[in-house]
Amino acid sequence: LATLLTPNIPEAEILAGMKIQNKEDIQNAALAISKLGSKYVLIKGGHFQGAEKIDYLFEDGKPITSYRGLSVNTRNTHGTGCTLSSAITSYLAREMDMNTAIAMAKTYLSGAILAGKDVQIGNGPVNHFYEPKALFIK
């Protein structure tokens, strides 16, 4: 099926059939979601309140891995979930391990969010082309 699922908190709540309010809930939800057939579950913590946003990677039988990121005060967040999963996929295609792929994808996404432009109505898009040369790996 899929190697990695990347639900945000509301999506994870639906997939797991439970409310998520803390890290223990995230672990229980990730375990339930992994039973759908995915080796890895990355629950994105962007919907939690606070200055720091933490994503949690679950792999059955291993300790949960946390990926920290700053909360950016912007409305230009349209496409962040798709951008993150696509970036992870691109790094995996370059034969990086899952942890490295996620860390690099989060770095890329942070830059794309910071470079996003206002469109005056609703949530604007992230800027996928903010600094592509810096991301090239030789």
Give residue ranges: language-model regions.
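Active-site-adjacent loop and "lid" segments of alpha/beta metabolic enzymes
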Residues: F48, H78, P132
